[in-house]
Amino acid sequence: MLSAIWTGFVTLFLCSFVQGAPADNVLPSAASFYVPSIPGIIPNPDYRLQIYAGHLPAESNKTLLASNDVTAHLYFVMVKNRRVADKERVVFWFNGGPGCSSFDGLMMEVGPWRWDGQPEGKESFIVKEGGWEEYTTMVFVDQPPGTGFSFTSTDQYAKTMKDAQWHILEFLRNFYQVFPEVLTMDTYLAGESFAGQWIPYFADAILESSLQIPLRGIAIGNGWMDARRQYLSYLDYSLKMGLIKDNSEDWKEVKAAHDRCEAHLEKLEGDPIHIRECGSIIMKVINQKRPDNEKGEKMCLNMYDVRFTDTSPACGLNWPPEMHAITHFLGRKDVVRALHAERHPGSWVECRRPVHRAFKDGEEESSITVLPRVLSKIPVLIFAGDQDLICNYVGLENMIKSLTWNGETGLGTVETQSWSVNSTATGTWVESRNLTYVKIFNASHMAPFDLPHVTHDMMLRFMGVNFSSIVGGSAMIPSSLGDAAKPVFVGGHLPQPSTPALPAGKTPEQDKAMWEAYYNAGSAALVLVLIMLVIGLFIWYRRRKSRLQLPSNQSGELAEESIPLRSEMEDRGGNGVSNGGAWKGKARASEPVFEVGDSDEDEPSPYRKPDGGGDRNV
């Protein structure tokens, strides 16, 4: 009796002080996601960053899961805008795959910092101009579950676009509960490569949902969207770019693969995302015979930037060179802790192959079938770096020519305009019936990596930013579209901005987040002390009671709590390159099968079932 009373007292005492694990429908506060600093990111006093990061559930609390399944969580990093133009805007950024982390976009393309060039182990990153966060809040999302720092059970990886749509809607539902102010911002989705599939499907789901998100447009860079046209573009692109010579032996091999693909497409129904029978075309292009390098290694064409070569069979998978430093950086425990990513066991990898393989099982219709429906509701930007082979501009232009939307096929008779940034010819620009197509000169598969200021200007124009309302930073870079030049104020004639640039130091919002975080940390420490005190008293009481009682002949053995998940993960270097070959890039160059999106090695999963069952389809 006394034991029961004591147990009840302890329970009530603990409940009065301890905030336990939140229920499925209880989310952490915004302050708990606040990132005051990141080790290895060299701050710039002129560019004050507000960063929030962490995991949010990507499943409804009504979802029926097995007892040993993990609730899917997506990981995000939000960088709030440093300056405000005419209105608040937010861009959700997605990289490709399937299974590739949006840290590619954050660390190398549209984020606020760049690698300093130091070797792996000594790397740091410098905050500098060119990031899209200057005038726009950026949210980088690792999806589907299992990608980057996101996690789920291995048998719960997304298998279809519907799975991925559902996860992103649940994530957004929770995201807006934590950050309700973002729901009032003009919203855009952007990304590249296989995000050409994700983004139209996500936009369609958002527009049909009850979330009431003010989605104003989507932007896709060098996207994989229309397999029928894009596979058949490799021959034409290679000839235009001088990668092969007409009627040469190389041309004959590429042409034979092209003809086999074309014959297969004539019999094929529907618009699938991948067509295995067509994958050999690009392999014929990149694997033309070339002289060995000085180390005697075989060389091939970089499929993401045809200005470069790479060792075989990587053929671009070793590019960009920043990836090794980024992978090492994101493997540091202090960085993982600062980014609130500890819940993800094991090392970060750029692209996770089991996620990639699980998704490919579905018989999926390409996003080209969804795009006309999206175009009937919101503007769409398709941009293409002209040095990319794998998702080249020729294929995208052929796609647009054959696409029917808003009552017509193709762009029609609209005029293509010249576009320049900083007095340099940058590309061409054309708009028709909600579709904007931009070809960017001297840019690769990752156009923002090559030309950050150029792609930033492009995005500001697409979002309709009033250039007269912004000053400082990129506002000082001249640009023009056709005959219309962006207003640039110089000398002593700068007007007062509609909303001034954010000053150095912390804003009231940051101070609030910081003090709330301190308060939570102090409260947690106090609670921990009280818990230890109560537990100590309880143990003392139990030991004293056991000395006064007769020994029990009942077995005191307790079944160990069933732990449904195993958290081991082999560390194979974390660089996305397996012992058996190169897997870093957006395709598997060792196989004659075209796949947009990186794939890492077959690593043991952190969420493997306790019966020893392996990853699905691995």
Curated annotation (Swiss-Prot):
UniProt keyword terms in alphabetical order: Apoptosis, Carboxypeptidase, Glycoprotein, Golgi apparatus, Hydrolase, Membrane, Protease, Signal, Transmembrane, Transmembrane helix
Q: Which GO terms describe its biological process?
A: apoptotic process; proteolysis
Catalyses which reaction(s) = Preferential release of a C-terminal arginine or lysine residue
Q: Where is the composition biased (Basic and acidic residues)?
A: 605-618
What are the EC numbers? 3.4.16.6
Among Gene3D superfamilies, the record links this protein to: alpha/beta hydrolase
Q: What class of enzyme is it?
A: hydrolase
Similarity field: Belongs to the peptidase S10 family.
Q: Indicate what this protein is called per its UniProt record.
A: Pheromone-processing carboxypeptidase KEX1
- Species, as recorded: Coprinopsis cinerea (strain Okayama-7 / 130 / ATCC MYA-4618 / FGSC 9003) (Inky cap fungus)
